[in-house]
Structure formats: C-alpha cells, structure tokens
C-alpha cells in the first residue's frame, strides 16, 4: 500500500511530519489497507465535509485551528472507515449511529491513546 500525503494550506509543520509518519504506521499495523490511499490535509473546508470525509482511496481532513490530537482522531476515524469498506467489504451505513460509525468513533479514540502511550515524547505536541 502506498500512502500519498497532500497538504493544501494545512498549517501542519515540518516538526509534526515525523509524528504523523509514526501515526500512519500505527494505523496500517492495526487496520491494514491493501490499496493505495491519498490523504489530503486542508486549511479550509471543502464542499460539505465536517472535519473529515472519505471516498474510496481518498481521505480529506480539515486541520485549521485544530489540535494535532483532534486531527489524528479524524484521520484514524476515516482510516477505519476505509478499512471497513475496502477490506471488510461493508456497505456504507448511516452518518449518525450504526455499526460502522460507532466502531470508527470508538477505534479512533483508542488509536490516539495507543499512540500517546507508545510515543510519550510526542504527548505535549498532541495539544498544539
């Protein structure tokens, strides 16, 4: 799986890049994807997205005025959805509630906490 990262006025600093790379490795370990994935980090909302959205093989994440921890949670949430649909072959469910959405919410929170325990040197940066 090849991961392509695009920054569109995201505000993510070079200092944060290494931290993001480690988080992507954790996501791939816990929820492995087979197909290539593009993640676009945005400084401004696109279309009707909330803080994140997913299309097949493409995730958009809003970064402006958000803590790194919140951005990570959104990335994880959408990554779990990508896994649900491409690996588990689940159908798209409701945006509010439902098995897919509830699992993505729960796993996203867990993945952020796992990352913080595994990389305590980044904990302070998570709140920037």
Residue locations for each model-derived region?
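Active-site scaffold of zinc-dependent metalloenzymes
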Residues: 33-69, 82, 86
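Hydrophobic (often cysteine-bearing) scaffold residues that line and stabilize catalytic clefts
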Residues: 16-20, 72, 76, 100
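Histidine-centered divalent metal-coordination motifs
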Residues: 77, 81
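Short acidic DE-rich linear segments
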Residues: 126-128
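Zn2+-dependent metallopeptidase catalytic core
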Residues: 13-35
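Post-HEXXH active-site segment of zinc metalloproteases
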Residues: 69-73, 85-114, 120-124
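A short, highly charged nucleic-acid-interacting micro-segment common to nuclease
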Residues: 8-19, 97, 109
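Hydrophobic or amphipathic, alpha-helical segments that drive membrane association/targeting
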Residues: 1-13, 31, 37-46
